[in-house]
Amino acid sequence: MIPKVKKKVTHRRDNNKIYGRKQGDYDFLKNWAIIRKWAIITYGLKSTADLEILMFLYSEKLFTRTQFAEHSNFLSWDKDRFNRLLREDWIYIWRHRNHQETHLYEVSYKGKKMINSIYKKLLGLEPIPESVRRNKIFLKTAPFSHKTLAIAIKNHNKELKERKLRPSPGLQ
C-alpha cells in the first residue's frame, strides 16, 4: 500500500521575489545580422546561403563536390551554386581528378580574406568601414535598405569604440 503524503503548501509573496540573472560570457554574435548583410553587399554574394556555405567550407579546408552537396541540402536550394562559386573564384580546384581520385576543392584566397575580415569584425578587432570609397552602402545613391544598414553600422562602430575605451573587468 502506498502511504499518503501531505503536500507542503507554499505561499508566494510578491514583495519578496528574488530574481537571478546570469550575464552571458560571449556577445560577438550580437551584430551578426549587420555584419552578414554588410558582407553580402560588399562582396557581391548572391545570398546568405552562399556566405554560410563558404564559412562551412573554410573550416573544412579541402572538400569534394559530394561534401559540398551534403552541406547544401539544408540551405536554400540553388542548383548552380557550386558552379557559380567556382566561376566567381570563391572556390578553386586544389587537385584535379585522375582515374582513382576525385577533384579536391578549397576556398580561394579571395574567400579566405572575406571570412577572416568577417571574423575580425565579429570579434570586435576591426570596425566596419564607413567611407564611401571602402563601403558602397554609404553611397548617396544607395537604396533605402542600404541607408538603414548604414545607420546600424554607425551605431555598431560607435559601440565598438566605446567598448575599446572602457574594457570589461573580466578581461584584465
Task: Give residue ranges: language-model regions.
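A short, conserved structural fragment
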Residues: 86-99
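Short, cationic-aromatic polyanion-contact patches
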Residues: 42-47, 96-120
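Short, amphipathic alpha-helical interaction segments positioned at domain boundaries
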Residues: 109-144
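Short alpha-helical segments that sit at the start of domains
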Residues: 20-53
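Eukaryotic partner-binding/assembly regions in large regulatory complexes
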Residues: 1-17, 161-172
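Short acidic, hydrophobic short linear motifs in intrinsically disordered regions
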Residues: 59-72
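Short amphipathic alpha-helical elements of helix-turn-helix/winged-helix folds
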Residues: 52-60, 114
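Short amphipathic alpha-helical interaction segments
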Residues: 73-87
